[in-house]
């Protein structure tokens, strides 16, 4: 079972939710042996730690969504990590404009966060 959170920096509730789920699995494993003994769990609370931290530094950064990778244009840093996967990359729902919130990146898997996952 794969569970992740924090792929978009501004979605602060998802890392907390993933952490809560992990706590419940650990503390109540006897109540659900079918989940804890018969499945392998892979849990990553924050996929985009740099973006997440940046969104929490100052109020003006609160709605930051992307990673923090420099793209050569000041103010347009980052890539939407959820648009940088190898599956259906550049297949709609994303942008090739590095200033867009849905910027897919210069190439598939360009973000270190995606390659590590």
For the regions a protein language model found, what residue spans apply to each?
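Conserved phosphate/anionic-ligand binding catalytic regions in large, soluble enzymes, centered on
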Residues: 8
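Active-site/substrate-binding loop(s) of hydrolase catalytic cores
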Residues: 2-4, 12-117
């Amino acid at each position: 079972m794969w569970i992740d959170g924090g792929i978009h920096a501004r979605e602060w509730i998802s890392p907390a939710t993933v952490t809560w789920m992990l706590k419940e699995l650990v503390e109540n494993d006897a109540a659900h042996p079918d989940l804890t003994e018969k499945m392998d769990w892979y849990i990553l609370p924050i996929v985009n730690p740099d973006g997440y931290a940046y969104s929490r530094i100052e109020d003006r950064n609160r709605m930051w969504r992307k990673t923090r990778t420099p793209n050569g244009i000041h103010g347009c840093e980052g890539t939407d990590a959820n648009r940088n996967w190898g599956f259906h990359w550049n297949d709609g729902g994303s942008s090739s404009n590095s200033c867009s919130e849905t910027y897919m990146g210069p190439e598939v898997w360009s973000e270190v966060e995606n390659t590590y996952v």
